[in-house]
């Protein structure tokens, strides 16, 4: 015990000696400004403290390179021409000055702030969750407090520059403010506090005004309320003390605000960059101290991670011969095929099983996510009351239970895993993460952007505070790790495109990142570029698209990322769109990506009237039905969608009507079967009906590897010849179904395209039956024996000892060959060369 006391005393002495105060200090807010470079006005700037006080970036500020990661600088975004529009909520129409006021209400044309939170401007869309700053410890007053940040001067200015301003509001209507300004010419700061009638000059180091040095300076302001003394530090060095004063907090304001980098009229920009701005309740420093390192997890977590690495994608470069080696190849398409006669690639819808979750009461999000944990327990995640993420579990995949989680209580629920309104995402297990963060979840949060969450076990998630993407997302995001490209791939809804009728059309863009935790790669699209691209795309008329939700709420995706999933005018009926793609990398074969797009057929905003009339309330439907289709890809970028036969359609399922079928994200393997789940309901989208009793989660069963097959006709033979390839192994194994009256034979061609003796198609023993795995067999000397036409099997007996059969293809491995399939009335699902 004595050793422990001495250790504590030693730590305390070191702590005090370094200048760190022994005050009870709490972080009120910490803005590291580590969002992506170039993010648009209206994007959220996140607070890393537990208080979670968001700011919004304005046209008068930019995210730029900083001391640690990125920083904030009060420099204006490129000027744009604002379109004429009557939309007040989105800030595209200027309102007159209200009676009794002096300031014009905020709109895009006058919103030249740098970074802002506000309780006013309520004529605009505000969805990010601003707080009243006057009700927080940001409202500096009669308590001990610390304000600190890193600063780099970048230009000279004869005017005072604002670090921050907090006002009771309404903004610009009075002088009830607390404000910190930099007086570059006097090498000092000014603290203005109207309630305390204070204008305090704070001497500082002259070097903080030297914009030519390129240096960064850590600036701290510590206020001792008992002494009425403010202490200023530059790079941990105490500066000349200013006069004593009494700082009094502002009164609560119904329209209070906090502005960073500019004042409440958007004037007096700070002539430099500001990084890692932290407000604390308490005195963090009392004597000289070494300047702190970064507080941001974005910077601290810069550790190299060895990623799980798969084989290089096989079909990206179209190189021949194809190094197939021992990869399994699913016959999803003709990517491996050089010659095709009478073969078609067909969808194989799953078999309907049973309802596994019914008697659904209360809010229940249709966007489900199924996953199997390390212990074989199955989980279904989806959002329930207030969009809180919940989980159900099952040992057998059929009987599902609501677990009683220690932290799972909310309303009448016991299975809540995330106590934030953010149920529009996907849970997955990150193979590259530490054990404490293996479980990941991605979702839109509070319309602030797309956020990542982490968990050790999937029972309780915690949010990384900085969004990985600055865009709001209106539907379930999809995310997976692609081991073959060592990238995390995600798909996000965009509402930028429009239907032929001009209504919003749902499509999905794709993002890729090598680092899941840091903000993901982003490149802004200029107004000029947006207008140029709009010439060849059917999109809304608002350019740039970030204007869409007004200056105080982030926008959706536009042209920043490739649009991967959307309706195809050449095959889809008009006013049809992709609700969610449900895209994933197939776990049991390389070079195989599957998606199950949820496709929405609109009644409203369509044509002709004979279609629109289906939405008539008297018909009791709604805005349209929804089905699930299937799509395939070899790289996760280029997709082929198979609309028919529909993968999961409408109709009677287990004697219940289904008019909306939403595939769950994820799949489970059980032996020779793939289990999938979907949410089905009898009501239509945007339904007129109030009866939701017949809504359920259903299980469906797919053959292993059986989503798409290469099908040969029944009435004649079909042929497939592969491109030249090189394989490894001594057996060729097929997943194939010929039923009773179909058959298949397989052979090899050499590098010159000639049949290889002993391995010709004619030498192949007929494949007849239904097999998940069957080894191809050859009968190379069958020609040495009399024809068996019209003879009985007993007549073979004298020759059987001379028959030579072989499944061994090792003599061909490593050589350039082509594989030939001759089939009739058969379905070929996959092939794989194996060592057995």
Explain the meaning of each model-derived region.
Residues 120-122, 252-276, 283-284, 289:
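Extracellular glycan-interaction patches encoded by glycine-rich segments
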Residues 215-231, 738, 824:
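Localized edge beta-strand/strand-to-loop motifs within extracellular or lumenal beta-rich domains
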Residues 20-126, 240-243, 276, 290-310:
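Extracytoplasmic low-complexity segments
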Residues 234-256:
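Short, solvent-exposed beta-strand-to-loop segments that form ligand-recognition rims
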Residues 30-33, 47, 147-155, 164, ...:
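Short hydrophobic/aromatic patches on beta-strands that form ligand-binding or substrate-lining surfaces
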Residues 304-477, 481-580, 585-658, 678-836:
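Beta-rich carbohydrate-recognition and catalytic domains
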Residues 161-192:
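Glycan-recognition/cleft segments
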Residues 190-218:
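Short, aromatic/His-centered strand-loop micro-motif at the edge of beta-sheets
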């Amino acid at each position: 015990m004595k050793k422990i006391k001495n250790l504590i005393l030693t730590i305390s002495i070191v702590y005090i000696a370094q200048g760190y105060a022994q005050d009870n200090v709490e972080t009120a807010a910490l803005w590291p400004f580590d969002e992506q470079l170039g993010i648009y006005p209206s994007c959220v700037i996140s607070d890393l403290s537990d208080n979670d006080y968001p700011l919004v970036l304005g046209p008068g500020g930019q995210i730029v390179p900083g001391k640690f990661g990125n920083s904030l600088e009060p420099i204006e975004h490129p000027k744009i021409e604002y379109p004429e529009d009557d939309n007040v909520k989105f800030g595209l129409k200027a309102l007159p000055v209200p009676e009794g006021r002096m300031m014009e209400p905020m709109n895009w044309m006058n919103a030249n702030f740098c970074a802002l939170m506000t309780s006013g401007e309520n004529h605009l869309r505000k969805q990010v969750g601003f707080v009243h700053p006057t009700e927080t410890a940001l409202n500096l007053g009669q308590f001990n407090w610390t304000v600190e940040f890193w600063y780099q001067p970048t230009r000279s200015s004869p005017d005072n520059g604002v670090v921050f301003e907090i006002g009771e509001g309404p903004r610009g209507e009075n002088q009830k403010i607390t404000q910190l300004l930099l007086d570059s010419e006097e090498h000092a700061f000014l603290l203005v506090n109207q309630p305390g009638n204070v204008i305090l000059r704070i001497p500082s180091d002259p070097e903080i005004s030297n914009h030519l040095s390129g240096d960064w300076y850590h600036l701290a302001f510590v206020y001792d309320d008992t002494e009425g003394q403010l202490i200023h530090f530059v790079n941990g060095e105490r500066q000349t003390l200013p006069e004593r004063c009494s700082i009094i907090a502002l009164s609560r304001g119904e329209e209070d605000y906090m502005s960073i980098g500019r004042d409440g009229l958007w004037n007096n920009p700070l002539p430099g960059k500001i990084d890692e701005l932290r407000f604390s309740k308490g005195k963090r420093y009392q004597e000289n101290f070494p300047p702190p390192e970064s507080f941001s997890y974005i910077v601290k977590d810069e550790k190299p991670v060895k990623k799980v690495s798969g084989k290089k994608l096989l079909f990206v470069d179209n190189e021949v011969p194809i190094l197939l080696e021992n990869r399994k190849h699913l016959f999803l398409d003709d990517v491996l095929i050089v010659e095709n006669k009478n073969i078609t690639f067909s969808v194989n819808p799953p078999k309907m099983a049973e309802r596994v979750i019914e008697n659904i009461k209360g809010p229940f999000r249709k966007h489900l996510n199924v996953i199997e944990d390390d212990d074989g327990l199955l989980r279904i995640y989806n959002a329930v009351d207030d969009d809180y993420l919940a989980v159900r579990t099952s040992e057998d995949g059929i009987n599902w239970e609501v677990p009683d989680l220690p932290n799972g209580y909310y309303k009448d629920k016991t299975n809540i895993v995330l106590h934030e309104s953010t149920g529009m995402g996907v849970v997955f297990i990150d193979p590259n993460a530490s054990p404490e963060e293996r479980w990941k979840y991605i979702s839109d949060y509070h319309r602030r952007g797309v956020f990542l969450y982490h968990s050790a076990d999937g029972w309780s998630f915690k949010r990384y505070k900085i969004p990985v993407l600055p865009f709001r997302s209106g539907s379930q995001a999809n995310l997976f790790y692609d081991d073959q490209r060592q990238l995390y791939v995600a798909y996000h809804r965009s509402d930028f495109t429009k239907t032929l009728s001009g209504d919003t059309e749902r499509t999905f863009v794709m993002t890729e990142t090598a680092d899941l935790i840091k903000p993901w790669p982003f490149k802004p699209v200029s107004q000029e570029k947006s207008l140029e691209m709009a010439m060849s795309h059917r999109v809304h008329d608002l350019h740039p698209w970030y204007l869409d939700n007004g200056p105080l709420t982030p926008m959706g995706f536009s042209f920043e990322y490739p649009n991967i999933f959307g309706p195809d005018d050449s095959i889809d009926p008009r006013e049809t769109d992709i609700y969610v793609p449900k895209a994933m990398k197939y776990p049991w074969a390389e070079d195989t990506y599957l998606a199950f797009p949820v496709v929405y057929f609109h009644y409203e905003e369509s044509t002709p009237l004979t279609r629109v009339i289906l939405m008539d309330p008297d018909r009791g439907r709604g805005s349209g039905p929804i089905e699930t289709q299937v799509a395939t890809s070899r790289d996760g970028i280029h997709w082929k969608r198979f609309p028919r036969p529909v993968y999961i359609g409408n109709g009677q399922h287990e004697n219940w009507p289904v008019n909306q079928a939403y595939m769950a994200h994820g799949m489970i393997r059980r032996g020779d079967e793939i289990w999938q789940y979907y949410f089905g309901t009898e009501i239509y989208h945007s339904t007129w009906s109030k009866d939701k009793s017949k809504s359920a989660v259903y299980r469906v069963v797919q053959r292993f590897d059986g989503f798409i097959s290469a099908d040969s006709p029944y009435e004649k033979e079909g042929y497939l010849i592969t491109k030249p390839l090189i394989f490894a192994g001594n057996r060729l194994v097929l997943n194939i179904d010929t039923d009773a009256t179909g058959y298949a034979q397989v052979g090899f061609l050499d590098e010159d395209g000639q049949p290889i003796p002993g391995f010709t198609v004619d030498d192949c023993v007929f494949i007849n039956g239904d097999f998940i795995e069957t080894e191809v067999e050859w009968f190379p000397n069958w020609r040495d024996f009399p024809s068996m036409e019209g003879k009985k099997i007993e007549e073979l007996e004298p020759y059987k000892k001379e028959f030579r059969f072989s499944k061994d293809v090792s003599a061909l491995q490593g050589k350039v060959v082509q594989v030939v399939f001759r089939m009739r009335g058969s379905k070929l699902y996959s092939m794989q060369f194996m060592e057995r």
